[in-house]
Structure formats: C-alpha cells, structure tokens
Amino acid sequence: MVRPLKPSQIRRLIRQTGVRKHRNSLRYKMRIKKGDTVQVISGDDKGKIGEVLQVFPERNMVLVEGVNIVTYHRKPQREGESGRIETKEAPIHACKVMLYSKKQEVASRIGYQITADGRKVRVLKKTGEILD
C-alpha cells in the first residue's frame, strides 16, 4: 500500500527537483466507485445505507446519498427575495464506509481477483460476490 507523503517529504521533493508539487495533487487509491452501494460503519450516520454519488480521490472522500446531511442558512441575494434554508449531502471519509451487498444484506471488505479472461475484478470478501 502506498502511503501519502508527509509535508516534510513534499518540501524535500520541491527542493531536490525544483518542481512545485502541491499537497492536493496526491491521489488516493479508491476501492469504492461511483454507483456502489455502501454502508456507513462509524460516525453519526452509522448503519445508514446509500449509493455513492461522487468520489473525491484527492481528498480520499466520497459523497453518499442521504448521509451526512448539512444545513445551510442562505441570506437573500436580491432585494425583495427572502432567505432560505437548504440541506444537502456533504462528503465523508472513505474509511468510514464499507461496500454493501443487497443480495446478502451484509457489509464487506473488498478484495481483488483475476477472472479466467484476464480481467481484474472487485470481490466482496464475506460473500464472494463479484462487483465489476
């Protein structure tokens, strides 16, 4: 597993190569894809099940439908307009979710297998269900 660089290592890279690398240019290996069904395993929304709407590999976060709902109080932008309260999903860290099998109704870790035709596919470790 590749570990993310520490800030001191990034500064050393910049000095050695002369190339400016920003910390946010690092990308994490995401085992969860858009459209996957996941279950939240920790935090305020523990136990909730939802579909992944978006993946953010630079921040190692995912946006899950119906999870981590935040409320925004918006001021009126124009004269005569009234303020409003908006709610929407906010991203959560990828380590807080596990893939969920709808057939077996169980959350599981992810493994990888190579099929007979040479494709690398994701597999649920508990059930053996192939995802890709």
From Swiss-Prot:
<protein>
    <recommendedName>
        <fullName>Large ribosomal subunit protein uL24</fullName>
    </recommendedName>
</protein>
<comment type="function">
    <text>One of two assembly initiator proteins, it binds directly to the 5'-end of the 23S rRNA, where it nucleates assembly of the 50S subunit.</text>
</comment>
<comment type="subunit">
    <text>Part of the 50S ribosomal subunit.</text>
</comment>
<keyword id="KW-0689">Ribosomal protein</keyword>
<comment type="function">
    <text>One of the proteins that surrounds the polypeptide exit tunnel on the outside of the subunit.</text>
</comment>
<dbReference type="GO" id="GO:0003735">
    <property type="term" value="F:structural constituent of ribosome"/>
</dbReference>
<keyword id="KW-0699">rRNA-binding</keyword>
<dbReference type="Pfam" id="PF17136">
    <property type="entry name" value="ribosomal_L24"/>
</dbReference>
<dbReference type="InterPro" id="IPR041988">
    <property type="entry name" value="Ribosomal_uL24_KOW"/>
</dbReference>
<dbReference type="InterPro" id="IPR003256">
    <property type="entry name" value="Ribosomal_uL24"/>
</dbReference>
<dbReference type="GO" id="GO:0019843">
    <property type="term" value="F:rRNA binding"/>
</dbReference>
<dbReference type="GO" id="GO:0005840">
    <property type="term" value="C:ribosome"/>
</dbReference>
<dbReference type="InterPro" id="IPR005824">
    <property type="entry name" value="KOW"/>
</dbReference>
<dbReference type="GO" id="GO:1990904">
    <property type="term" value="C:ribonucleoprotein complex"/>
</dbReference>
<dbReference type="InterPro" id="IPR005825">
    <property type="entry name" value="Ribosomal_uL24_CS"/>
</dbReference>
<dbReference type="Pfam" id="PF00467">
    <property type="entry name" value="KOW"/>
</dbReference>
<dbReference type="InterPro" id="IPR008991">
    <property type="entry name" value="Translation_prot_SH3-like_sf"/>
</dbReference>
<dbReference type="GO" id="GO:0006412">
    <property type="term" value="P:translation"/>
</dbReference>
<comment type="similarity">
    <text>Belongs to the universal ribosomal protein uL24 family.</text>
</comment>
<keyword id="KW-0694">RNA-binding</keyword>
<keyword id="KW-0687">Ribonucleoprotein</keyword>
<dbReference type="InterPro" id="IPR014722">
    <property type="entry name" value="Rib_uL2_dom2"/>
</dbReference>
